[in-house]
Structures are given as structure tokens and as C-alpha cells.
Amino acid sequence: CTVMALSRYESDERIPDKFLMDALLERLGFQPSKYEFVASDQEFEYSMKRAQIEKLLYEKRDVQACREALQEYEKQVQEKERLHRQYILLKKGLILGREEKYSDAINVFEQALKCTECSETNVANQTDILLTNTETELLYLIGKFLYIDGKKKDACTYFRMLKNQMEQRPAGKEKWKEYYPCILYRLAQCEFEAYNYGASYALQIHIVPSDI
């Protein structure tokens, strides 16, 4: 959020909704699931829609039903509700990935990052930038799909960027658990294929850090 908006939150002139509060906590390295919030009816409905989408996508693996649920969710979201639009684009990109349409998925992920004015350039050039879990996932998935699509050099640019970001922000260790070992593994593969065996080994021995 902007400095002005943050000032209003701090002075109780404005109250962030649940999803914005989640994003702010994630940027600070905290897990929103460890905190309790009083949600409005609209926020509760959005939460239920997300739960339905997650179940359809990951448990039932019903792509068509998931796509329809996303369309219903999207109808309720206003243009200014950027965090919700970002979430919808993330899931749309994941569906495209399931269909092996990796280039299309990457384009959708890049659109999603723009919802919060986040980009590979911003993250690479700003050492003090704080990422939400969704932004971290989007950047990781861009790298992953680039790698699968054979664009390994471009993929490693994203993986190195995220590795540096995670190591500079130890407060956000919850974000490491899913992505950090995968990032090290992909980077180790890239170094091995470039005949940099020492660098590859150095990455491999840290794939399961003791502090994760």
C-alpha cells in the first residue's frame, strides 16, 4: 500500500479489509493464518469462494468446474479490488499450466504481478522489497514454467532472484518451505548442465536447510 494509506491505517482513520491485512502481514514475514480477524459478509463470501476454488483445483482436479468458479468469483470483484484480481489471475495461470500452455500462463502471471505493481525488475533492483505469498508464488511459477518450456537461462534469473530475496528476508521463513528447496534444485541442475559441478554441489547440499 502507499505511505499515505499506511499512515491512515496506523492512525485508525481507515481499516484494511481481511485480504489487505493478510497481504500486509505476509510482507512483514508473518503468517495471517496465525491471527484471527472479524470479517464482513463480503469478505466471508470471498473466503468461501477461494476455498471452493482451491478444492476444485487441488483435490478434485476438476479444471472446468474450477474455471466456472473463477468466473463467478470474478463477476463479484470490482476493478479496484486488486488483490482479488491477482488471485483470480494466479489460478487462471495455473489452469493454463495444467493444460501445458506455459507461454500463455506466464503472460497471465505477469498480468497478475502488475495488480500490485510488482515485477521481476522491481524485485531484482530493490533489496528492501517485501513480497506477499501470492507475489512469491507468481514469480516462482514464472521461473518454473520457463524452465519446463526449455528457457532455462531465463528461468534461473527468476530462481536466483527469489533465492536472494528469501535469504535476505529470514523473517519470512514460512515462504521458504514450499519453494526454497525447489529453487535450489533447479539452480543446481542449471549449474551442472553448464559443467559447474562445484557450484552445483554447493547448492545441492543446502537443498534441505536445517532451519526450514
Predicted regions and their residues:
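Recognition helix of helix-turn-helix/homeodomain-like DNA-binding domains
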Residues: T2-I15
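Structural motif corresponding to the intra-repeat A-B loop/turn of tetratricopeptide repeats
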Residues: E59-K60, E99, D149, L187, ...
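Residue signature of alpha-solenoid helical repeat architecture, marking inter-repeat boundaries
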Residues: E43-F44, K80-R85, Q126-E135, E174-E178
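DNA major-groove recognition helix of helix-turn-helix/homeodomain DNA-binding modules
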Residues: F19-K34
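TPR-repeat structural position
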Residues: D62-V63, Y102, K152, Y197
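Amphipathic alpha-helical segments of tetratricopeptide repeats
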Residues: L70-V77, E110-A124, T157-G172, Y201-D211
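"A position-specific structural signal for the A-helix of alpha-solenoid helical repeats
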Residues: A51-Q52, H84, L90-K91, I95, ...
